[in-house]
UniProtKB/Swiss-Prot annotation:
Main subcellular location: cytoplasm
Gene source species: Haemophilus ducreyi (strain 35000HP / ATCC 700724)
Subcellular location: Cytoplasm
SUPFAM superfamilies: Diaminopimelate epimerase-like
Enzyme class at the top of the EC tree: isomerase
Task performed by this protein: Catalyzes the stereoinversion of LL-2,6-diaminopimelate (L,L-DAP) to meso-diaminopimelate (meso-DAP), a precursor of L-lysine and an essential component of the bacterial peptidoglycan.
Oligomeric form and interacting partners: Homodimer.
GO BP: lysine biosynthetic process via diaminopimelate
Gene3D superfamilies reported for this sequence: Diaminopimelate Epimerase, Chain A, domain 1
UniProt name for this protein: Diaminopimelate epimerase
Residues flagged as site, Important for dimerization: 268
InterPro entries (alphabetical): DAP_epimerase_AS, DAP_epimerase_DapF
Pathway: Amino-acid biosynthesis; L-lysine biosynthesis via DAP pathway; DL-2,6-diaminopimelate from LL-2,6-diaminopimelate: step 1/1
Length: 274
């Protein structure tokens, strides 16, 4: 099976063309491939499939390192766009793809950057899913470690976002693990720790569902900015500094799609026998 290794700001992926080759993967196979000592090693595996809808170009599937399938990965979407272009699966800069929970528009901006229309942030608790009687800008969540005030949103996957005073001192691993599996998130959650520098700039660390902390999380950056704008502490165009690099997020508010722009890097091509 042929594959490519790619990364978006250090969030690394094994990307597989399921259009020109037959691909069958089990959870156990994905876990073995994800092993950084005995396999290929990655945060997520991305699978390019033929479109389910004839009006679209591709179907985009994402699997975490633990083998679980998820509906969204923003950094992966940028790498997905770069991959299908590099492999000659498409010959235009705009592409239309479906995911498990919706549709996306991906645009190759230049040789480095990809712009992703992430769609509208989802705030309705039942659709996130998140257990709450109604939408609130802030929710109180209690854990064994501490009680936190957070925003909750879906960018195609559930996100919990909390503000911290110092990103370096944030208890990302301990608190992130507790909030990821909090009982109010039936499908678990990605947990973002956001330090606001000013209304146009934040620092962010993300504990990803099924993965742990990664160098960068595109949907997490989108979620953090959406929450910050909804809470009135950020403006419409925000630079997000992650451990792996920088993303630019734009959102004009409710009823409008959110856009993410950032790099997508091809590392190498490989072949592996399954």
């Amino acid at each position: 099976m042929q594959f490519s290794k790619m990364h978006g700001l250090g969030n690394d992926f094994m990307v597989i063309d399921g259009v020109t080759q037959n691909v069958y993967l089990t959870e156990d196979m994905i876990r073995k491939l994800a092993d950084r000592h005995y396999g290929v090693g990655f945060d997520q595996l991305l699978l390019v499939e033929p479109p389910y809808d004839p009006e679209l170009d591709f179907h985009y599937r994402i699997f975490n390192a633990d083998g679980s399938e998820v509906a969204q990965c923003g950094n992966g979407a940028r790498c997905f766009a770069r991959f299908v272009s590099l492999k000659g699966l498409i010959n235009r800069s705009d592409m239309y793809v479906s995911t498990a929970k919706g549709k996306m528009v991906l645009t190759l901006v230049d040789e480095e950057n990809v712009r992703v229309n992430m769609g509208e942030p989802i705030w309705e608790p039942a659709k996130i899913p998140f257990i709450a009687n109604k939408f609130e800008k802030n929710y109180i969540l209690r854990t064994d470690l501490q009680t936190v005030l957070c925003g909750v949103v879906s960018m195609g996957n559930p996100h919990c976002v909390l503000q911290v005073d110092d990103i370096e001192q944030a208890t990302v691993h301990q608190l992130g693990a507790l909030l990821e599996k909090h009982h109010r998130f039936p499908e678990r959650a990605n947990v973002g720790f956001m330090q606001i520098i000013d209304r146009h700039h934040i620092k962010l660390r993300v504990f990803e569902r099924g993965v742990g902390e990664t160098k960068a999380c595109g949907s997490g950056a989108c979620a953090a900015v959406a929450v910050g704008i909804m809470q009135g502490v950020l403006d419409a165009n925000v630079q997000v500094s992650l451990p792996g690099g920088t993303l630019q997020i734009e959102w004009q508010g409710k009823g409008k799609p959110l856009y993410m722009t950032g790099t997508a890097t091809h590392i190498y091509d490989g072949f592996i026998k399954l």
